[in-house]
Each structure stands twice: as C-alpha cells, then as structure tokens.
Amino acid sequence: MTNHLQLSAEEKTFGMLCHLSALALFILPSFGNVFGPLIVWLIKKDQSQWVDRQGKEALNFQISMVIYSIAAFFLMFLLTLTVIGIPLAILIGLGLAVFWLIAVIMASVKANNGEDFRYPLNIRFIR
C-alpha cells in the first residue's frame, strides 16, 4: 500500500527508524526488539500521523514476534526430546529468525521510500 501524502525527509527517516530500531535486539537481547520501536514511536507519534502508523505497525510486529518466539521455543523444546526432532527444531528457530530479519529490512526500506508497510502475520494489539 503506497502512501499518497507528501512526506518530509524527517518523517521518512523516523518511519524507517520505527522498523529498523528493532535491531536493538542485538544490543539488548531481552526485548530490545520491542523497546527500540516503542521509544521511537513514543517520541514521534504526536508529530506525524504517518510515523504514528509505522510505529504501531512495527511495535505490533515485534510484540507478535515475541509471542511467536515463545511458542516456537516450546515447540522446539518438545521436538528436541526426540532425536529426529533436533534438526526440525533448528530449522524452526532459524526460519523464524530469518523471517523476522527479512521483514524488518523490507519494512525499513519501504518506510524510507515513504510507503506504508504491513507486516505479514502481525497481530494488531495497538490500533
């Protein structure tokens, strides 16, 4: 979905940062992916409706990914109880991580271009 409004360079930058700040996970392994977008969104949500939408989308996706990761962890744990389940558990974990990284990068690029981005499999907690 393309946004038809004229966006300033600052709006595009902060829209991109809403998504890209999820990479804070690599600095703060415990929920850095949630705190990064949350901080950017809270700072800029009242200054631009578009940045507000991008921040909500990014934050909802990161919260969704935490839930999916917890579910995957339990599934992986159960699978590792069987010898054949270990490779499948590794594939599940890697698949989820790759999906997350690709989605964050795609959203960041789209936002930097001034386009709205909707994450797949996103649970919309914040509307």
Predicted regions and their residues:
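Membrane-interface extramembranous regions at the lipid-water interface
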Residues: 1-65, 104-127
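Short hydrophobic membrane-inserting alpha-helices and related fusion/pore-forming segments
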Residues: 25-33, 74-91
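Charged, glycine-enriched surface loops/patches
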Residues: 62, 69, 84-87
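Hydrophobic alpha-helical transmembrane segments and immediately flanking/interface helices
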Residues: 86-110
